[in-house]
C-alpha cells in the first residue's frame, strides 16, 4: 500500500530539504537586518505606500518583530512564493509522468487512476508538512538570537494554519495536472492561476461592495499578519481551505479516471 506515495515522497526529499534550508537561511538574513531598522521610521515609510500595496502584503506594525516577520517572511515568501511553488510542483507531477510516458508503466500495475491521484497528492503533502516543521524552529531561534521575543504559540499557529492554504494551492496545481499533458504548460498555468487569485483578493479586499469576490482566493482565508500581530486565528478559513482541497482532489481523481491519457 502507498507505494506510489512513498516513491514520490522520497523523490522529492532532497528538494524539500534544500528548500527548507533555503527558506530558513533567508529568514535568518531578514532577521539579521531587523535591529538596524530600530531608529528608522518604518511606519511612516509604510504610510507612503499605496493602500492597495499595503493590503496585498498585509503591512501592519512593521516596526515590531511580529509585523516585520509577517511582511518580510510570511506574506511574501511563505504565502506568495511558496504558494506558487507548491502549485507549480503539483502541476508538473501527473502531467510530467504522462508526458514522459511513465504513467503508462504505472497504470500497467494493479492500481486505479484514482489511487494514483490520491497517492500523488499524499506525496505532495510531505514537503508542506516538512517545511512547516523545520522553518519555524529556524525563525524562532533567529528571533532569540537578535535579542527579540515572539509568541511561540502565534509562530506555531502561523505555520499550522498555513498548511490548509498550501494544500489548497497544491490541489489547484494537481487539478490542472490531470487536465493537461505537458508539464511545462501545466506548471505555468498553475502559477498564473494562484497569482491571479492572489491579485484578486489583494485588489478587492479594500474595495467597497466587491470584497466578496476575494472569497474565491485561498489567500482570503489565511492572514499571517493577523496571526502574528493580533493573535487572531481563523479556524473557519482553515476549514474552508481544507474543504476546497478535498473537492479539488476529488475532481482531479474523477477527471483523471475519465480522461484519455496522452490525448
PLM regions with names:
Residues 160-199, 203:
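A structural motif at transmembrane helix-loop-helix junctions in multipass membrane proteins
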Residues 83-90, 138, 171-172, 218, ...:
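Hydrophobic/aromatic residues in alpha-helical transmembrane segments
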Residues 1-24:
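Aromatic- and glycine-rich beta-strand/loop motifs that create alpha-glucan
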Residues 29-67, 189-255, 259-263:
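Terminal transmembrane helical anchor/hairpin motif
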Residues 69-93:
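Long, hydrophobic alpha-helical segments
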Residues 87-107, 121:
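Transmembrane helix boundary and interhelical loop/hinge segments in multi-pass membrane proteins
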Residues 118, 122-170, 174:
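Secretory targeting signals
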Amino acid at each position: 500500500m502507498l507505494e506510489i506515495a512513498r516513491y514520490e515522497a522520497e523523490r522529492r526529499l532532497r528538494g524539500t530539504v534544500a528548500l527548507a534550508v533555503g527558506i530558513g537561511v533567508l529568514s535568518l538574513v531578514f532577521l539579521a537586518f531587523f535591529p538596524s531598522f530600530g531608529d528608522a521610521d518604518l511606519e511612516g515609510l509604510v504610510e507612503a505606500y499605496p493602500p492597495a500595496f499595503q493590503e496585498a502584503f498585509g503591512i501592519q506594525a512593521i516596526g515590531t518583530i511580529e509585523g516585520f516577520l509577517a511582511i518580510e517572511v510570511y506574506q511574501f515568501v511563505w504565502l506568495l512564493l511558496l504558494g506558487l511553488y507548491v502549485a507549480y510542483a503539483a502541476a508538473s507531477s501527473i502531467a510530467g509522468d504522462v508526458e514522459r510516458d511513465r504513467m503508462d508503466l504505472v497504470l500497467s500495475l494493479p492500481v486505479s487512476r484514482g489511487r494514483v491521484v490520491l497517492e500523488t497528492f499524499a506525496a505532495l503533502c510531505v514537503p508542506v508538512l516538512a517545511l512547516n516543521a523545520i522553518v519555524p524552529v529556524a525563525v524562532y531561534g533567529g528571533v532569540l538570537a537578535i535579542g527579540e521575543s515572539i509568541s511561540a504559540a502565534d509562530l506555531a499557529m502561523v505555520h499550522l494554519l498555513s498548511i490548509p492554504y498550501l494544500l489548497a494551492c497544491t490541489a489547484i496545481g494537481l487539478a490542472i495536472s490531470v487536465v493537461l499533458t505537458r508539464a511545462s504548460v501545466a506548471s505555468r498555468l498553475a502559477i498564473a492561476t494562484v497569482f491571479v487569485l492572489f491579485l484578486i483578493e489583494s485588489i478587492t479586499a479594500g474595495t467597497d461592495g466587491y470584497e466578496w469576490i476575494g472569497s474565491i482566493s485561498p489567500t482570503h482565508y489565511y492572514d499571517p499578519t493577523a496571526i502574528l500581530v493580533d493573535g487572531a486565528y481563523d479556524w473557519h478559513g482553515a476549514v474552508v481551505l481544507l474543504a476546497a482541497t478535498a473537492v479539488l482532489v476529488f475532481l482531479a481523481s474523477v477527471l483523471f479516471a475519465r480522461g484519455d491519457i496522452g490525448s
